[in-house]
Structure formats: structure tokens, C-alpha cells
């Protein structure tokens, strides 16, 4: 979240000459800002959901439903909603804008969710994340027993290898060192 994951603490420690674990301030800032991450990762060929950035007070001309609405720099899925129609979209925008002035609206990917940890540039086994109900929101992340995690994920080896490749490439492209976790989706057609 803010300060700890967005690079502010790291930048302060760098200025003060204090050592810390983890990656530097710039890669932390890139990783925490979904808007900035897209600007860095998409040109590197890394697949990401299509979407747009909205600033408070501006309207989207066209939004395909369903869509995902989320604060630009938040963490833990706080303020994230799935909107299936205009009414839900307006409520999702109001919720996301209550956290910050910039939000992302992305296409909804119908599929399975995975997480890949990267340690010193090398991807670890792929983990599948299966909420027992709804999507992997704040409640499902932190309420005991609400999510099933399978490691290694029950997916073909070539898909797991591709997910590990993308996780490593995300870290390399954003300049992330030491350790990270990359979230990935596998759609119903087998696309990552």
C-alpha cells in the first residue's frame, strides 16, 4: 500500500543512507501504480488487460461490460469492483474514487487467477488462487478459509513455464530485484 510499497519509504531510506530489503524506490513506484506499470510493461510485450485510466471529474466515452474498476495505486484489492452494467459501473467508480483521484477501468477477464513469486530474478512454482465465492477481493484475501490456494497449480507444464517467464519479464522490465509477486490470469481460451 501507500508509503511501504509505493517507493516512498525506500526513497527516504536511500536519502538517509539506511539499508533495507527489497527492491529500490523507482521499481516499487512502477509496480504500485497500475497506470505506470502498464506504460512500462505493455511496450515490453507483456500481456495485460485492455483498459483506460480515468481521473476524478472525467467520464469514459465507452465502457464494455463487464469491466473491472480499481484505484490506480491501491493494494490488496481495496476498492476493486466488477461492473456488469451502467448502474454498477457508476457505483464502482464512486467507490474507487473514494480511495484516490485516478482509477483504472479494465476489460473483465473470465478465467482462473494465479500468482507467481519471483526470488532473485527466478520464478518459483505457480500458485492457483480460487476464492470459494466471488472474486479475489480484500475479504477473500484476508479471511481465513475463504480461498483455496494450490501449489503447484494444476495446469500444463508449458502454461506454468509461460507464466513463470512473464513473471520474470515483469520484474526485469520494471527493475524489480530481490523478491516480488506477479498476479496472472488464464482466460477460458488458454491465454495468459
What do these predicted ranges mean?
Residues 84-165, 186:
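Phosphate-binding site of ATP-dependent enzymes
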Residues 77, 132, 192:
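Glycine-rich phosphate/pyrophosphate-binding beta-alpha loops
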Residues 1-32, 47-50:
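A short, GP-enriched loop/loop-strand-helix hinge that lies immediately N-terminal to
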Residues 107, 118, 171-192:
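Conserved metal-phosphate-binding beta-hairpin within the catalytic cores
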Residues 28-112, 164:
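Active-site nucleotide/adenylate-binding loops and adjacent lid/helix of ATP-dependent enzymes
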Residues 21, 49-50, 124, 136, ...:
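A short, local hydrophobic-aromatic micro-motif
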Amino acid at each position: 500500500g501507500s508509503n511501504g510499497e509505493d517507493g516512498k519509504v525506500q526513497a527516504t531510506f536511500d536519502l538517509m543512507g539506511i539499508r533495507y530489503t527489497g527492491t529500490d524506490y523507482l521499481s516499487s513506484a512502477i509496480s504500485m501504480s497500475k497506470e505506470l506499470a502498464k506504460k512500462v510493461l505493455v511496450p515490453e510485450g507483456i500481456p495485460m488487460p485492455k483498459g483506460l485510466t480515468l481521473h476524478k471529474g472525467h467520464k469514459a466515452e465507452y465502457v464494455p461490460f463487464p469491466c473491472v474498476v480499481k484505484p490506480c495505486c491501491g493494494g490488496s484489492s481495496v476498492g476493486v469492483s466488477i461492473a456488469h452494467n451502467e448502474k454498477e459501473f457508476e457505483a464502482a467508480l464512486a467507490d474507487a474514487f473514494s480511495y484516490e483521484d485516478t482509477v483504472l477501468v479494465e476489460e473483465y477477464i473470465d478465467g482462473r487467477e494465479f500468482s507467481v513469486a519471483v526470488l532473485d530474478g527466478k520464478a518459483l512454482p505457480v500458485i492457483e488462487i480460487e476464492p470459494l465465492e466471488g472474486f479475489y477481493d480484500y475479504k477473500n484475501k484476508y479471511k481465513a478459509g475463504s480461498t483455496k490456494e494450490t501449489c503447484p497449480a494444476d495446469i500444463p507444464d508449458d502454461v506454468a513455464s509461460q507464466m513463470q517467464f512473464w513473471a520474470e519479464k515483469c520484474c526485469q522490465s520494471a527493475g524489480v530485484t530481490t523478491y516480488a509477486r506477479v498476479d496472472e490470469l488464464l482466460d477460458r481460451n488458454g491465454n495468459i
